Amino acid sequence: MTAIAMPMPSANRAERHFYLAMAIAVVVAVLLGFARTVFLRPWFTEYAHLHAPVETWFYVHGTFFLLWIALFATQTSLMTVGKPALHRRLGALGAALIPVMLFFGTVGALIAARRPTGFFDVADPPLQFLAKPLPDMVVFAVLAGGAIAWRGAPQTHKRLMLLA
């Protein structure tokens, strides 16, 4: 009795489509998660008290973090369509973006903790509030840094990038 083996290109294609689907899911989650408080804030009356100007810092922070999400989706798309050379060139932008995100994420968390209403009306005490974003920055640094360190090992690299 002979076993029928699945051809490798098919398995590889399925894996690439899995990561593309995950990247799309991340984009959708970010858009839905921030729709009421950021992207569509003027249309949600329960957030009317948040229509006051938000510190520029948070817009800059959000821009860099959205850039990371867009870059992640682009990078995944490039590998799905078989463009690894462009993926590697854009990877340098991602590597440069990591310390910028760590800086803006950490300082943004510290600024939000000082606000009387917290960050978008999450009025937790400052130390309690910081228990979420500061460890998030450490985990992101470890995962993204690990992904860069293991970029020569595609299976490890792609998993770390997805988790970052």
Regions found by a protein language model. Name each.
Residues 49-63, 122-134:
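Short aromatic-rich membrane-water interface segments that cap or initiate transmembrane helices
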Residues 10-23:
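N-terminal membrane topogenic signal
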Residues 74-82, 144-152:
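Structural signal for the C-terminal ends of transmembrane alpha-helices
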Residues 77-111:
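Hydrophobic/aromatic-rich structural module bridging two neighboring secondary-structure elements via a short loop
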Residues 64-76:
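Central hydrophobic cores of alpha-helical transmembrane segments in multi-pass inner-membrane proteins
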Residues 39-49, 114-124:
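Membrane-interface helix termini and inter-helical loops of multi-pass transporters
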